Amino acid sequence: MEKLAALKKLPSILRPLLTSKSSYHRVPSDRPTIMDAATSEQLHGLTNRLLTEVNALVSSYSSIDCQHPFLAAACESQNDGSEARSNILSSLSEIEAIVRGPKEFLENIAIQCEMLGSIQWLGEFQILACIPLSQEVPIQDVANLSNVPEQQLAQMIGLTARCGFLIEPRRGYVAHTPLSASFVTNPSHLDAAMFLAEQAAPAALKSATATQRFTESHTNNETAFSLATTTKVPFEAAQEQSPRLSRQWAAYLHHAGGLPEDHVLADAMAKLHWSNISKAGGQVVEVGAFLAAKPLARLFPQLRFLVQLPAGASSCESILCDPSDPIKPGQISIANRVPGSPQSVTNAAVYVLHLPSSVPSQILTELQVHLPALRMSNGVMLIMSGRVLPGQDEPIRARHAAVAHARGLIMYQMSNEVEMDLSSLLQMLDTVRDSTGKLVLVHKLRSCSGMTVAVVVKYQLMAGGAS
């Protein structure tokens, strides 16, 4: 309720900016100057958009009586406001980029640097778990329980509380905010933060040294990560040796890597005409992951699914054994397939391909081995492009693009892998051909944010070709 009250105040804070006749902009000299007309118009447009987005979020929270116990779950599930929140943050980022100067830019870097260090410190000493989820507690008690200096803990809280992570309800006391509490109730949030603090940030700060020392190297054990960790073990091998690192990396990709969430993928895929395939009792082959088969099987009982996973991938059998699930017995089958091996199923209506990595050569191999199957089946293939960087012409907001490019940099600093962008993927598709035909782009599936989450391709005969 406090969050809702704060949101309702935001429009009154923003309106003076819309009605102001003299807007100021900070320039590199740090001296205020009158904005040019184009920049002023852009700022007013962004502010109007932000007001609309705030009102949309307030409406989503207000549409259900969340205080009524019977409706609390519905409020949480139907009005989580994730899309509206994302839009608001994107607009705020664009406004900030216009109005901030070097001073504000550096101040923000300083805050984020110490915030990351503070959260890592709080996590290392398990302090967040020592604070009750729903009541305040003396900072001294938390310090004693965690065996850390009270003064240092108070300093950490002094910063994080100003950023909405923990709160000081009164002097000498601390309590959780919804944000900090989520790092206790959902430990993967803390795993993601610990990865950023312990692996990503140190590797990023070794990037210059890595460039100087490994100028021409493309091997996966001569990286910024290897310098930061003083090891010659490649990042992928390090994950195999350390379950903690593997868990933290997965948490980072899920929460902060800019990858589309499962429900976003499901919404985008639902736009396709699966019912046409379902009526014909068609088969769908999902390659490399088990994400699309289950939600689609619930919607279309006549569809049959084969999920092909690499040997050693975590078993999905238990997922198929839930007696309460409406999925029909035998509707989904699971088989092993080595990435890059020929596609043995040549009569599927749809192939859903999850790219094996961001390495162009591996992506090209997967596309080439599916070409004969697409030619023989006359089917289509969905290439899930969540791990592909957005192209320059993508209608995606700057904040979402920045998150994706941050992931690309982290991937490079960890393993020397360069993530492909969407334009490069489409150019690669044009090279996948045989003597009679080639792959052609049919459609792009976009999320609500404008990100392309999948491209739909098919096999097309070339002029003079014969099947």
UniProtKB/Swiss-Prot annotation:
Q: Mostly located where?
A: nucleus
What subcellular locations does the record give? Nucleus
Which GO MF terms does the UniProt record name?
DNA binding
Tell me yes or no: is Iron among this UniProt entry's keywords.
no
Gene Ontology CC: nucleus
The ranges the UniProt entry gives for DNA binding are 139-158
Cited InterPro entries: SAM-dependent_MTases_sf (IPR029063), WH_DNA-bd_sf (IPR036390)
Q: According to its UniProt entry, what is the function of this protein? A: Transcriptional coactivator; part of the gene cluster responsible for the typical purple-black color of the ergot sclerotia. The ergochrome gene cluster produces several ergot pigments including the yellow ergochrome secalonic acid and its derivatives, as well as the red anthraquinones endocrocin and clavorubin. With CPUR_05433, coregulates the production of geodin.
What protein is this chain from? Ergochrome gene cluster transcriptional coactivator CPUR_05432
Q: What organism is this sequence from?
A: Claviceps purpurea (strain 20.1)
